[in-house]
């Protein structure tokens, strides 16, 4: 993958959605919740007012409506501003 986010943006690979409930019921694709965590795979350079706190490899939590979904090499990613990242886990 050859993509580099600009300014204060980060590229995140979302965690896989749950396939089954704790009781063993298989969840159909139409009912799966969007995961709210993922791994940082690329980081921009930041801005003159804001340094980048997150780094490649960090696992993070983000808001439900944060970011823009993109597809690269057949895989789904989210690109969002660092401010949309809620926490590093």
UniProtKB/Swiss-Prot annotation:
Keyword Cytoplasm assigned: yes
Major localisation: cytoplasm
One of the Pfam families matching this protein, by short name: Cpn10
Gene Ontology, cellular component aspect: cytoplasm
CDD domains: cpn10 (cd00320)
Keywords per UniProt: Chaperone, Cytoplasm
Compartments (UniProt record): Cytoplasm
Keyword Repressor: no
Molecular function terms, GO-annotated: ATP binding; metal ion binding; protein folding chaperone; protein-folding chaperone binding; unfolded protein binding
A GO biological process held by the record: chaperone cofactor-dependent protein refolding
Function: Together with the chaperonin GroEL, plays an essential role in assisting protein folding. The GroEL-GroES system forms a nano-cage that allows encapsulation of the non-native substrate proteins and provides a physical environment optimized to promote and accelerate protein folding. GroES binds to the apical surface of the GroEL ring, thereby capping the opening of the GroEL channel.
Self-association and partners: Heptamer of 7 subunits arranged in a ring. Interacts with the chaperonin GroEL.
UniProt family annotation: Belongs to the GroES chaperonin family.
Designated name of the protein: Co-chaperonin GroES
Originating organism: Parabacteroides distasonis (strain ATCC 8503 / DSM 20701 / CIP 104284 / JCM 5825 / NCTC 11152)
């Amino acid at each position: 993958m050859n993509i580099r986010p600009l300014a204060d943006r980060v590229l995140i690979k979302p965690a896989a959605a749950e396939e089954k409930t704790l009781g063993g019921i298989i969840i159909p694709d139409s009912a799966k919740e969007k995961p709210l965590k993922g791994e940082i795979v690329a980081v921009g350079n930041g801005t003159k007012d804001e340094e980048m706190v997150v780094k490649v490899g960090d696992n993070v939590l983000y808001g439900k409506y944060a970011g823009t979904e993109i597809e690269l090499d057949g895989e789904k990613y989210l690109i969002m501003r660092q401010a949309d990242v809620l926490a590093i886990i």
